[in-house]
Design a protein with these regions (language model features):
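Non-globular, low-confidence helical/coil segments that flank catalytic cores
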Residues: 1-283
Length: 283
């Protein structure tokens, strides 16, 4: 387990799930989120790694699980968590998925599990964000209804922002997706807006008490892939507003593989620390 603790504010934990991914987020209000939940090198990851952590921090509910994409090493424990939620007092309130034009048998099975557990599903695309107290979670990828080359290309890219802390999580996004992110971010870097004039994000989701969850407002996209707008920027600090990819901590793409986390992305992100979630003999 790798723990990033901001005293009294925000805890981010990268769980040791071997060749897989699971990042836990706990706000100062003790609201808990997960980004992915899976492994291909460890069996029963939910039972032996994720659920014990949830019990350790004493959570009463998981406000949401962000599934960057549905490869096994990112979702293998989701079914376990849903079953545990049905039989325990810890409820999973929502699951977030990338809003892409790609469906396959694995996704259909996952959606069926979610439906049977009576958990709501929200689809995210670039430009949308949610607020939970002081924590802002921005979606930077994919653009709405993207037709991805494969599951990796469908990956959610999330940016956590609270005060002067930012964390970028890129799922298994590879070079073509990173190139798109960099292209969208460059206008904000090359022509930064003055403080106080940052462009507002088009929609927001505020976390409400149990039973009062607000539906995610969406802005339909009518642009083609080649005509997508630059990523809007409205984080909490001026430096972040000038560069939507700038981060304190970067969760390396595709478990640190050579076809991800390229120099162009690193040049814009300029992380102080890079984390890699992987197992033995990772390539």
């Amino acid at each position: 387990i790798f723990l990033i603790r901001l005293p009294g504010e925000l805890n981010v934990t990268m769980l040791d799930v071997g060749q897989g991914e699971c990042v836990g987020i706990e706000t100062r209000e003790h609201h808990v989120y997960l980004v992915d939940a899976g492994s291909t090198s460890k069996k029963k990851t939910g039972q032996y790694q994720i659920i014990p952590w949830l019990k350790y921090i004493g959570t009463r509910s998981v406000e949401g699980i962000f599934i960057t994409h549905w490869d096994e090493d990112h979702i293998s424990a989701v079914g376990e968590l849903l079953e545990w939620s049905k039989s325990s007092r810890v409820k999973i309130r929502r699951i977030f998925l990338p809003d892409v034009a790609l469906k396959d048998e694995v996704l259909e099975t996952l959606l069926q599990q979610i439906e049977e557990a009576e958990v709501s599903v929200e689809y995210l695309s670039a430009g949308e964000h949610m607020t939970d107290g002081a924590l802002q979670i921005y979606c930077l990828h994919p653009y709405a209804k993207k037709v991805p080359e494969d599951r990796n290309d469908a990956s959610l890219v999330l940016r956590l922002s609270q005060g002067d802390f930012q964390m970028l999580l890129t799922g298994d996004l590879e070079k073509s997706g990173e190139d798109w992110l960099v292209e969208q971010a460059r206008p904000a870097v090359e022509q930064p807006q003055p403080a106080g004039q940052e462009q507002a994000l088009p929609c927001a989701l505020s976390t409400q008490p149990a039973g009062q969850e607000q539906a995610l407002s969406r802005v339909p996209s009518t642009q083609s892939a080649a005509q997508e707008q630059a990523l809007p920027c409205a984080p909490s600090t001026q430096s972040a507003a000038q560069n939507p990819l700038r981060c304190t901590i970067l969760d390396a793409g595709h478990h640190g593989a050579s076809n991800a986390t390229g120099e162009a992305l690193l040049d814009l992100a300029q992380p102080e620390l890079v984390l890699i979630s992987c197992g033995k003999n990772n390539r």
